[in-house]
């Protein structure tokens, strides 16, 4: 073969190899470009799904915030649109999201666009005030609230008091006079039949009850009898639940768990002191009755009235604790109506005496339990 032909064939092979390399590189670049394009499309779709999900979750929050910032609403036939005065929460994000928000032109992310019907109302505030004044003048005491709901009637009384209500604003109402009359009758009746001691104020009550606090440990260990624990155990046995529910509590006869003539307020005050000293001890107990009631309720409805029963035995010089239980069961009405109505703290005494005087019971102040200074 001639040298020139050999050189020509060699050059041809080199060009073929170069073209093959260029073709393979082009194919690789093509595959790489296609892969980048696919990846970009996947990322864009993921961003779109994330934006739609976030818009769905934050729609209510965005709408509420737009209302709070008083964003003006523009109503068009069949669509609800917003005039963008401030950047919304959905507008923050990437450039793709910004472009999508720009194309939406302020449309709220509502999946179903409903037709809205706007009924304009022209209400003058002065006209409303004039109508209210006319209604007040024309209303009679017998039918002042006819055709008005209870809630609206209450607002009307507060905003526009009638002369009939303001006439007796500085004196006791008839219902308050009847209440004090009933309290006086109940107090006088129990004092005559049982000669009950006058209810103690909180400071002296705790001072005299403190010496009976060791009974808490004895009651928890079963070494001391307790009428209130027997009642609590009976309620537990009637239940099918692991703990005392609200419905079961409402069905309980709470008169069985009330500390007689001491009343509920003093009973709760003693229970707070019991929890202050014995909460950890009570919580460590494995007693099923106690766990069904719970620590706080067990202290209030079992331990506190039991300690006050011991104090009752001392105050009334009763021979046995059973006698004190009988007194506690028989004087529940006195405790709820008389003792709970009177003052518990020292600073409540002047206000209570002022109420009695305003109700016309100043002559009975010496008989009032709260007036005893001890």
Curated annotation (Swiss-Prot):
Organism: Lachancea thermotolerans (strain ATCC 56472 / CBS 6340 / NRRL Y-8284)
Full protein name: Restriction of telomere capping protein 4
Region feature Disordered, mapped onto this chain: 1-31, 75-106, 129-180
Protein family: Belongs to the RTC4 family.
SMART domains: RTC4
InterPro entries to which the protein is assigned, alphabetical: RTC4 (IPR039024), RTC4_C (IPR028094)
Acidic residues composition bias: residue spans: 93-106
Alphabetized Pfam families for the sequence: RTC4
Task performed by this protein: May be involved in a process influencing telomere capping.
Keyword Cytoplasm included in the entry's annotation: yes
Gene name for this UniProt entry: RTC4
The keyword Cytoplasm is annotated on this UniProt entry: yes
Record keywords: Cytoplasm, Nucleus
Gene Ontology CC terms: cytoplasm; nucleus
Cellular compartment(s): Cytoplasm; Nucleus
